[in-house]
């Protein structure tokens, strides 16, 4: 089994002995005409950069990118969190056109838009992971944008993994729908 893990900004000390890590900050979303040598200077893998560049299918010029067409992700939870979520979604579209994969896993609501986009492009099944819903985290003071993202993720998922039966049972679903939801502790 091969695992490809896409993270916003790798730090370089991640354990890659059992998976491949792709830094979203090194995936071009806007075409830039640069030389191979310059790509070598600016990225860890020029061949991969050009492979991903050929996967650009949409116009993301509205998104701020650097000199090689990549988003500079913060790697933290910034004040512009929703902007980072949708920039990550743009990166995922390039990867979905560039990589071979069998399944998409979106770990939490922050990556649901990216997972949904990858599913729509690839036709591959989407599995989402739910730790808690915004309703649970906010004690009923739900952020409408977070709620919308969570709902879209749950509606689009082929399977939902929750961290507990309590979380699983908090979803108001039919018996047929509940078969899509697993609880793992």
Feature annotation, model-predicted:
Residues 114-115, 171:
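Hydrophobic packing residues within well-ordered alpha-helices of enzyme cores
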